[in-house]
Amino acid sequence: MLIVLININNKYYCYNILIMEPKEIDSTDNNLVDEKVDNNNNSVIESNSGSDSESDYDTDSFTDDDSDDDFEKQQLERLENAGRDIDTFKNWFKNKTDDSNVYNVFESTFSPEFRSQLYEYINEFFNNNDIVTDQLLAYWKILIKNIMRSNRKYQVIASKINIDENTYDSNLKLFKEKSMFRCFMDEEPICYFKENGNNYYVS
């Protein structure tokens, strides 16, 4: 208790003041504040919940299925294009196997784009027996032999190459090495068969 004397107009007044100990107010008693906090928390929770849900939905919607389907579609389309161009070449070549000038005729018949694409298809699908058949390989080897005959360096070797058009047997073997073919005759390497975007050649 505190006693206070106050002088007013030469008169003293005595006041007893009761001092109470401070009491800590529990925040849980403040319902208004708790309600606001709760409301804010609720809205935050609801907002985050909605955001998470949307995020999960978006994540699920971006799958690899679409990209896989597109890739398979492109591969199938490329395979069909390869088969079509190769059939065009085979149908054209089958009546010209004895032509000593067959490569020059081939070059003048088909555009550089077609020749370049044909070479690329045969190189790419070389190990696919459904696309690169024994018949195609026989025609391909005849074409290579014809190119070799027009090159003085390989004329003698070309004269020793045998290709059976009925059984497709040949002593000329081809091995794919990246974007070119390595040619062997009786297991001996003889040259490389290449393409430069315009012409076929051996080196």
Swiss-Prot record:
Origin: domain of life: Viruses
Biased composition (Acidic residues): 53-70
Region described as Disordered: spans on this chain: 32-70
Bias kind Polar residues: ranges: 39-50
Protein name: Uncharacterized protein R321
